[in-house]
A protein has these predicted regions:
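Long, compositionally biased charged/polar stretches
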Residues: 1-405
Length: 405
């Protein structure tokens, strides 16, 4: 192999290392696990179990607090697995905290996110409100279909109980819920940092401690982009975004980790040394033994074992998984209108499954299948799998209702 080919391979590895860190710390931890937690807490504190919005959102909070608590013990804590296996090391949570300062809840709605990232443009004639600039973009194509199904379901459901904006504005529980989700009633939040000599973190909404009950997203509560929660449209978009984050977004960033990154040379998470310069022994090694140079540069054996073991667990579906379009409580409501709306949602998701399967058979859509012959199924809802048995373990498909792993 020519040395320039080795340099190019190393360059791609450095990019992948940084992308791996962004994926784990931002796309996964921050943008799903961390930001959803204040909504979980506010829902349980401010909305009675008979409140229609509590019934709407409850399935999408299943086991989230439990898995987040475990994450703080072994993943995001000082000297935890994140610090051990991703390139920022001890700065991992600092990076998440810094990025959180510019986080925008409304931009996590998929159509808005795609436009912000330059992957779509506003298009009033499209049923999704946007048109894709890259048509063969499986995450966006499948995601917009799922997003639309979620938003249609939420809209129909909410309008059963809120026939006008005045009714919504007069709902004391709902307004208290939204206020708690945003406002810091007691404390100003301190951004994540180590306490001198302790190795422990003090942090914002990413590491909720004793003040969690009164915090929510308090440190960014004054941002002008927050919905005011005065219209049905705002409620529908807010609940749709919460459900999207908890279900489809988390499925897309989590359950493909082992299938796509289980072979560490293909997806290194740490770089052990900088790009070799001409005249150095590292450059000579790149010339004479490129494979050895590559292995010496990327994630170590111990870090690889820990990292692969971790994503193997994270990428696995449990046998009791409850997928989008399913309810684990058959008698979740006695309202026939709500039941009919949910059944329409379920059938819509099953239709999306068929569309995804057909697209994955289309040879012209190369990004869906690729040279590796690995079809994109991360946003395949798996609604039709009534007992979840066919999707147990590492399947790289299925959208669970909630962030439970």
């Amino acid at each position: 192999m020519d040395v320039q080919e080795t340099i190019w391979q190393l360059a791609k590895a450095y990019v992948t290392v940084n992308d791996s860190a962004w994926h784990g710390l931002i796309s996964h931890w921050l943008h799903t696990h961390a930001v959803i937690e204040p909504f979980v807490i506010a829902t349980h504190r401010q909305l009675s179990v008979t409140h229609p919005i509590h019934k709407l959102l409850k399935p999408h909070y299943r086991d989230t607090m439990t898995i987040n608590a475990l994450a703080r013990q072994v993943l995001t804590n000082a000297n935890g697995f994140f610090e051990m296996t991703v390139c920022p090391g001890e700065h991992a949570l600092r990076i998440s905290s810094y990025v959180y300062k510019n986080w925008n809840f409304t931009e996590q709605a998929l159509p808005v996110d795609l436009v912000k990232r330059g992957m779509a443009k506003p298009d009033p004639s499209s049923p999704y409100g946007v048109s894709l600039l890259i048509k063969d973009y499986p995450y966006a194509v499948d995601g917009l279909a799922v997003w639309s199904a979620i938003e249609s379901w939420v809209d129909e459901y909410c309008r059963i109980y809120y026939p006008s904006d005045d009714v919504l504005q007069g709902d004391v529980e709902l307004q208290a819920w939204w206020k708690e989700a945003l406002k810091n009633l007691i404390h100003k939040i301190i951004f994540s940092k180590r306490l001198p000599g302790s190795g422990e973190f003090v942090s914002n909404a990413l590491h909720l401690g004793e003040v969690v009950r009164e915090v929510g997203h308090g440190d960014i509560a004054d941002q002008p982009w927050w919905p005011k929660m005065t219209t049905i449209t705002e409620l529908v978009r807010t609940c749709s975004t919460i459900i999207w984050i908890a279900s489809a977004l988390h499925a897309a960033v989590n359950f493909g980790q082992y299938p796509y990154a289980g072979y560490l040379p293909n997806r290194p998470t740490v770089s052990g040394r900088p790009m070799p310069e001409p005249g150095t022994k590292e450059y000579e090694e790149a010339e004479t033994n490129p494979d050895k140079a590559f292995i010496h540069t990327i994630t170590s054996q111990l870090q690889s074992i820990i990292g692969v073991s971790l994503i193997e667990v994270l990428s696995s579906h449990s046998s009791d998984e409850v997928y989008l379009g399913q309810r684990d409580e058959p008698k979740w409501t006695s309202d026939d209108k709500a039941k009919r709306a949910f059944e329409k949602f379920r059938k819509n998701l099953i239709d999306i499954q068929g569309i995804i399967m057909n697209m994955n058979k289309n040879d012209k859509l190369q990004n869906r299948y690729g040279l590796a012959k690995f079809p994109y199924m991360l946003l395949y809802p798996n609604t039709s799998d009534a007992d979840g048995e066919s999707a147990t373990g590492i399947t790289a498909k299925g959208i669970p209702n909630s962030i439970s792993i």
